[in-house]
């Protein structure tokens, strides 16, 4: 499928019928009452003169009133994708019957195995996933590998494979036991993500100050119709039920954390792109590929403290303690107030057996001392 480069992420609702322990939304399974007119949304997108991919997300989109009608409306001229737990079986069946798979980029399906088991929904999940696959939809079943689930992931992956359902490990993003994930998987990541290096892209980079087309080619639509520049930048561009004023050109990113899709819209130098690749490889413990990318980045941006820090992380993983300390010292000397560099150097000097240095995500590092 030729997926449009213009993307709108519609956060339809924050309500969900699941209660996952690691979810950052409060559990709310009451009926959705705040709804938008899909015809108005479609008219806005049509008015740009460009095709769009509309990502339907939440919360749980399939509990949204009239969801199948909405999908039909949007797919007349645009492509959709859906983030779902695939638990509302009646709606899944209706979707499979009424919606053209050629107009659906994919269904990004969250397995949430512990919650699925709690509601006794494993068998229904298998039926729903197989129905969509057999109808020709692309179904990507993701498994959030919370640190407490690392050991059982392999077992669950093999179980669903027996039913013809491939499981993709998805890095947990957040804090667990004082460590920031996904960076904190360290070398453990190879066991889980070794066959899925693309999952290194699930990193919230710091693009602050870099030119970005978000607000023109990437939008976030809220449940009340408010349009933000992007998921990370809550600058209001208008309301889809009234008027929306899109940005022009590539205004700089204003946020230190890009939670979604930024890599498709930000403009990077060659060295910055190499730094990003190096981090992505490091997160999934593809350490040699990471080293090569970061060394190439450093050649293009000599003395970059973020790159030096990350090469130090890799040296530490290889057991090259002196080299790691040298790189951490160099990074900190260039940016003395950076808390991450301070913590890494202190940890390396302490030689604690459990020390695991942190990866730097500051792509525009020279502009951000902390």
Spans of model-derived segments:
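Core AdoMet radical
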Residues: 27-36, 50-64, 75-91, 101-125, ...
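Canonical Radical SAM [4Fe-4S] cluster-binding loop centered on the CxxxCxxC motif
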Residues: 2-38, 231
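Conserved C-terminal portion of the radical SAM core fold
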Residues: 54, 118-205
């Amino acid at each position: 499928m030729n997926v449009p480069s213009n993307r709108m992420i519609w956060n339809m609702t924050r309500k969900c019928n699941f209660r996952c322990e690691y979810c950052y939304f409060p559990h709310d399974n009451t009926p959705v009452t705040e709804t938008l007119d899909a015809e108005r949304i479609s008219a806005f997108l049509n008015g740009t003169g460009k095709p769009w991919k509309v990502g339907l997300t939440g919360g749980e989109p399939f509990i949204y009133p009239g969801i199948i009608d909405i999908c039909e409306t949007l797919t007349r001229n645009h492509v959709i994708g859906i983030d779902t737990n695939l638990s509302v079986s009646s709606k899944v069946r209706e979707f499979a019957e009424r919606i053209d798979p050629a107009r659906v980029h994919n269904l990004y399906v969250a397995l949430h195995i512990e919650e699925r088991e709690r509601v006794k929904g494993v068998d229904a999940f298998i039926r729903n996933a197989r129905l969509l696959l057999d109808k020709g939809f692309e179904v990507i079943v993701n498994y959030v590998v919370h640190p407490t689930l690392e050991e059982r992931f392999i077992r669950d992956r093999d179980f669903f494979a027996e039913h013809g359902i491939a499981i993709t490990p998805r890095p947990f993003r957040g804090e667990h036991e004082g460590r920031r994930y996904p960076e904190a998987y360290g070398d453990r990541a190879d066991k889980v993500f070794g066959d899925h290096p693309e999952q290194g892209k699930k990193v919230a980079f710091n693009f602050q100050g870099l030119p970005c087309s978000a607000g023109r080619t990437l939008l976030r639509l809220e449940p009340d119709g408010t349009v933000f520049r992007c998921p990370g930048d809550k600058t209001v561009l208008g309301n889809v039920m009234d008027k929306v004023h899109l940005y022009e050109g590539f205004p700089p990113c204003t946020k230190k954390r890009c939670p979604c899709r930024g890599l498709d819209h930000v403009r990077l130098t060659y060295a910055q792109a190499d730094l990003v690749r190096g981090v992505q490889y490091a997160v999934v413990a593809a350490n040699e590929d990471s080293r090569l990318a970061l060394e190439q980045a450093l050649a293009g941006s000599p003395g970059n403290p973020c790159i030096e820090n990350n090469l130090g992380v890799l040296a530490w993983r290889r057991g090259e303690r002196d080299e790691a300390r040298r790189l951490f010292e160099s990074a900190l000397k260039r940016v003395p107030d950076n808390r991450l560099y301070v913590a890494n150097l202190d940890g390396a000097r302490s030689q604690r057996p459990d020390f695991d240095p942190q990866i730097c995500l500051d792509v525009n590092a020279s502009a951000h001392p902390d």
